[in-house]
Amino acid sequence: MAAVYGIQLVNKLNTATVRRTYLPNRYDILIDRLTNHTQHNVLHRALDFNATTREATVVQLYPPLNAWTPSSATNVTDYTYLEWVDFIQERSTTFSEVLRQRYPITTYANRFVNPLVVGAAFSDFLNADDISVYLEHLFYDPRVESPVQAILSFPYQWTPRFHVFQEFIRTGAGCKYARSSRDMTPPTPARLPRYGKHRPAYATVFYYNTLAARSTILAGISAGPTALEHFDSPTYGPHIILPQAGDVLGYHSRPVSQADLLMTESVMDCLRENSQASASTAVARLDQTYHPVANFDPTNEDSMMSRLTNLALLVVQGAQAELAIPTVPTNDDVRGFVARLMSEGQRQRWFPYRTDRVLIHPDSPFVLPPGDFYAAYRVANFPFTSGTYTSVPNATKPLRVLPQYRAATILPAQATQAYEDHVIAPININHGYCISGGVYFTADDISIDPTPFPARDLAQLPQNYFDPNRMARRELLRRLRVPSDRSYLKDNAVFTFLASLVNPATALPALQPGFSLAYLGASAAHAKSDEPTILADLRNGSIPGLPIPSRIAQFGYDVVHGSLLDLTRAVPTGTFGLVYADLDQVEDAGTDLPAANRAALAMLGTTLQMCTAGGVAVLKVNFPTVEFWTQLFNQYATFATTLHVVKPIVVNSSEVFVVMSGRQSAGNLTCTTSLQRALLAMYARNAAIDQTMTHVPMLGQADDGTSALGMEAIRLFDPLFVEGNPNAATSALATLMANVVPSSIHMSRLPVNGPVSTTIFGKRTFLSTRRRDRLLEYPLPMVTAINHQRRFTAPPSFSIYPTEPVNVTTLVAAGYNAYVHTVITSAQPAHLFDLGTGPECRILSLVPQNTRVTMVDSRPCAELMQAYDPNTTAYEQADYTLAAFWNGRQCDAVSAIFTLGAAAASNAVTIDALLANLLPSIANAGTTRLWLQVNAPLAGPTPIPGLIDIDTRAGTYTFNNGERTEPYIDPQVMQATVLAHFPNATLSWYTLPPTCEWLDYIIGAGSSLDLSTIPTALQYSQLTPILSIDTNVAPLRVNPIPTPLGQQCAIRIPTNDPAAVLDAKHRGVPVITGTPAALTSLMGNAALQYIQANNEFLLQLTPTLAGIFDVTLTSAGQPPIPRGSFTITAPPPTAAVTMPANIDYTDAGNDGPIACDPYYNLAVCIMRNGQYVRVNPEKARVETVAAGRALHFVLDLADNHVLMYLCDVTPAAIGAIIAHPLADIYQLVFPNNTPLRASLPYIGGGARVELNNQPYLSLTNPPPVLPAGTALAALATAASVGQPTYTLPAGAYRYVLE
């Protein structure tokens, strides 16, 4: 088949053969066009009108509107489509009125209007300019003269934009397209092209009437852009078009001039019309293409204009493209056309270029018009015949390509040159969604912390919070979250927290059955409801452990089922047990922080005013500034018993929910270090997520390859990928595979009228860039699998984020990747050994390119090592657990991530036994820094169902429901094992911090995230931590060990710098910071002094916070140096209940003393849908008594079928540490000589009671008349609130589940 470079042509010629006769425009017809607003597509047509949104972005203009050249004073780009239509209709109607005032239609209806004059007049009228000169020459007689001749009779400058000379007319080309405010971003593949013809005066037009005048025009434009001309039936008369100088972006990786675009549009139009042409249909012109007539070099075959002209000379013959040209092409279609035209290929120039003439083959169906611009020209061996052609349809989906390499490389410069010839740039990317799922929820109890903290010193809202770039990144993240009811997600998280809220004085739930609810800020703006979506869950009891409210009242600005109120003012309402204020201060204050503070405090006052004594008040605060907290504690410290700050993280905002429980007038709330820790954590997390979003390109921004995160693609036509000496296709592919993440590579194959367009694309991230920068040469890929493909696919989908979020294991691995990069970059080891690397050589994308690294794994390497510098990069296929491997090895750093557990399992040894054999070899190699990930339960062996099951007897973890089993090691044993071989080492434990700095390696690396999986990932990390070992610095020493909570301890940190700054972090948040002269502690009383005699710091601390704390020292001008970790142990997480000697089976209940450290808040729960849910407090509850705490419970026959637990309750979870089964109650044998009670076991469960093995009472469907002696109990003591209880006379009952 013939081709002009990448434009494949079929061997059939087809054109229309009948030209439509031009009919002059009558005056009455013009008036109809201007005033007929009911008929569509008269003056304009929306090419992409959306019937749902009533919007359009690209509008094609028709005469006389297409003569409009908008002036700078006429700015309509801010209009929506409908606003633009209104504007045009109003102005066109007014224009017609102006015309009719001058020329009444009854008199002038059958006169012919000059289309050039009408267009110019309408343009100036829309620009609010004077049009009187045009009205003088509105009419002409087409029987006597042409529109151009009529105007040339009056040679002078009519207006600044319309100049009539003796021989020709000069005017600006009117816009042929308009765009709305919805299309202000750079072009994207799905958008429609405008070919630059939306720009005012995109070209200058010279109308002439004689060849002499044409020569004069050409002489005057002999320098500048390429001039173009329609030879066949030019509109209104012969004219030459001189496009604007400069380039139009968005159509090709290289600059495209305005002339190129006009020529491109004309060629595409002609190709489309050729494919649709029929002898039965007359057309305005047979040859739609332009012809360059000045400032054009046909010999420059690399220029776009030269190639377009070459193609146009074939298209005018009737040539058809194998790939169909859509009726309304998209940017993607135009870019693809241009890319194919500018790709490698043969020019196949069948017809020579003539400046003033187009040569036509005698066998072409094209009918030559009169005149000298077309001439016959016979070509030898012309491979075309007349006929039509039907294009081949596309197929299904792109194919994933996993790169494999052969033992050959290519120099980057050589490969990149080929890549640049085939790269698609810029790419109009589809972001997809990076955030999905529920919320990441945090909660902090402010009032439980005994250590006060000055409110004025609290962490302040970051000064750059309202920086435009930071606001843009927050908005970008919001838009990249899967569409959902964000208000519902937040409400659900907060109400779930409220279900676990406890009155500290009584140990009873803060919200008792029958509480009333006032929802402030209730909005009707929800997709499927005209009230807050959470209210449906509250009414049907769907929030686990939360009683159903007795009534719900709604208030706010946008309420439907309630009352309109300004909630910054006093309100005329009653009081409620729970006042929930989902109020936005930005509604009234915007980003004015002082105004927002005042609004928040006024709303808090209203919320508390509406709250009944003992109730709970909740307020959403958009900007929790120091000023807000200061006034909260100044004005409202006496209004509640407890204060919590909860944060449901849906997007990256600073808003928090303030929960004030136990409403009273004599409270004593104080600002504590707990609040400071919560704010520091939140702002650190905000900053981390903001940093992550710096990698992500803005929406609507075409990917030009400069952003850290994006897509790269090459497109080739009928590529021949070779295994021998690399050709251009193979070289370009090698560059692409070097640039992108290997696992992200896909290929798309599309038929292009015989030849195939092959697009290979992948995701570019900062990780792939690190790997590429380490390459000395680019490895050449094996192309067997690619060459084997004969399937066609769907077009490529340049989507950054996949639809499925990463799983928890991948989330943890990504977090550890971030840690490895940080510590290796900081430590700058001379030679790193990475153990258990894996065939994909992940470490190469984590460490700096100049770090010497040796990777060790028993599996063969999937990378081509000869492409790397052997002095910095090596791969050893070996078993690193063997002592023989280490003979003669030298390294100063070792990393082993997610490998030691598997190695121990494969060798059938424990981890400590494995390390006992491995660590001596590592020490002998000269290693001073180690980072060892191990299976070690730092917070105790608490399993994660479905992810990590723990067998404490066998000492093993089972991952992913049996996928693999590995041993685990006690953290203390791990430390002792390490210190046995590195006795002076500093040891630090690393787990994922909730401040989320590691999200860079998820969102910033192009992976999707389910926010609700973050807590699980943090828990997973607690079971699989990394131990950092540093023999270069002396370790800290702690006394006593273990170090219990609340007991003073001494921590000694060796250092020669008495001016060093000490930092101790807990879960990523600094809790101790400073020097001996100025020390701040957020974890209890602390004092720091420098002991000169011992060259050490002495930190004396009475801790109020349990956990693992990482200590660093920072000397002036130096990076922080880790000095180890110390652990503050919480009281033993044990609980026991002593059953009373005499059991009471009435509703008076029983009390059993509880033995459990008061550090733990307790509640009685049952398991429901995999989580612990509080039971009905009338059934069982924890009460505070003089001797401590007691379990109060009322017995029920259902107790033998529903196991209750005594669980710890924290703001974040229930039963995470203590879940003590109340087996004595579950196993109780009920007597037959005393009245008993019976209830349903749980919501949704059915049961019946049998007496003497005979049916007695159905609890599922109780009869209208109860058996004798049986009654509905006044006090319902079922495990679930709202279910009835029945009293039964003495008897031998059997309780049966249904």
Curated annotation (Swiss-Prot):
It catalyses: a 5'-end diphospho-ribonucleoside in mRNA + GTP + H(+) = a 5'-end (5'-triphosphoguanosine)-ribonucleoside in mRNA + diphosphate; a 5'-end (5'-triphosphoguanosine)-ribonucleoside in mRNA + S-adenosyl-L-methionine = a 5'-end (N(7)-methyl 5'-triphosphoguanosine)-ribonucleoside in mRNA + S-adenosyl-L-homocysteine. It is found in: Virion. The keyword S-adenosyl-L-methionine applies. GO terms for molecular function: ATP binding; GTP binding; mRNA 5'-cap (guanine-N7-)-methyltransferase activity; mRNA guanylyltransferase activity. The keyword Amino-acid biosynthesis does not apply. It holds the Pfam family Reovirus_L2_MT1. Transmembrane segments: none annotated. It comes from the Viruses. Keywords: ATP-binding, Capsid protein, GTP-binding, Methyltransferase, mRNA capping, mRNA processing, Multifunctional enzyme, Nucleotide-binding, Outer capsid protein, S-adenosyl-L-methionine, Transferase, Virion. GO terms for cellular component: viral outer capsid. Its EC number is 2.7.7.50, 2.1.1.56. InterPro entries: Ig-like_fold (IPR013783), Reovirus_L2_4th (IPR048604), Reovirus_L2_6th (IPR048603), Reovirus_L2_7th (IPR048602), Reovirus_L2_8th (IPR048294), Reovirus_L2_GTase (IPR048601), Reovirus_L2_MT1 (IPR048598), Reovirus_L2_MT2 (IPR048597). Outer capsid protein involved in mRNA capping. Catalyzes the last 3 enzymatic activities for formation of the 5' cap structure on the viral plus-strand transcripts, namely the RNA guanylyltransferase, RNA-7N- and RNA-2'O-methyltransferase activities. Belongs to the aquareoviridae outer capsid VP1 protein family. This is Outer capsid protein VP1. It comes from Aquareovirus G (isolate American grass carp/USA/PB01-155/-).
